[in-house]
Amino acid sequence: MKDVRELLKVNEEKLPRIYCDMDQVLCALLRTANQITGQDFSKMNKDTRWKIISNVKGFWENLPWMPGAKRLYQRIAKYDPYILSAYPEKDVNARGGKVKWVLNNTRIPKSRILVVKRAEKQRYATHNGEFSVLIDDYIKNIKEWENKGGVGIHHTDVSRTLKELSNLGYK
């Protein structure tokens, strides 16, 4: 991770925009999908796994929170974060369901919920010439984000992410 304190003399009144991923950061996609399919979802054939999930009514909007994720959300909520989540193209319910999840579980307005193709996430790395921060569990997204001038926090657990946010000035 870039040392943001060097890039920006952190002004706590004007911190960079935060984008937060959903799946495996805020909501427990894999645990729920593993329970529904009865197998390791990540190792299943993509067509097969998304066909199963797309047939589960309310799958996306009913995902449970990840352990500790409410603490993370409470920290970032005061900085008017955006949700930046990728949708699987093979599940027609994913985009709408993800938006419903955010609206039902957070106070983030619809105008700050971005559900895009995975490769499009990097387009948000900067805003008005300034870098933005991405919290994401997928290292490829973090690397692409940083290559486009943003600062990435590779989310592996809540405590680590909260520490990195503190180091960036998000208290």
Regions found by a protein language model. Give the residues of each.
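Acidic, Mg2+-coordinating phosphoryl-transfer loop and its flanking beta/alpha structural elements
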Residues: 132-167
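Short amphipathic alpha-helix with an adjacent loop that forms part of the alpha/beta core around
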Residues: 123-128, 164-171
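Conserved Lys-Pro-Asp/Glu-containing loop-to-beta segment of HAD-superfamily phosphomonoesterases
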Residues: 17, 113-145
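Short, acidic loop-to-helix structural element flanking the phosphoryl-transfer center
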Residues: 44, 54-83, 91-96
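Charge-dense, intrinsically disordered terminal/linker segments
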Residues: 1-16, 27, 65, 71, ...
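Short catalytic/ligand-binding loop motif for oxyanion handling, primarily in non-cytosolic enzymes
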Residues: 26-30, 35, 81, 90-94, ...
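Active-site neighborhood of HAD-like aspartate-dependent phosphohydrolases
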Residues: 3-58, 147, 157
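A short, structured active-site edge motif that brings together acidic residues
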Residues: 82-95, 99, 103-123
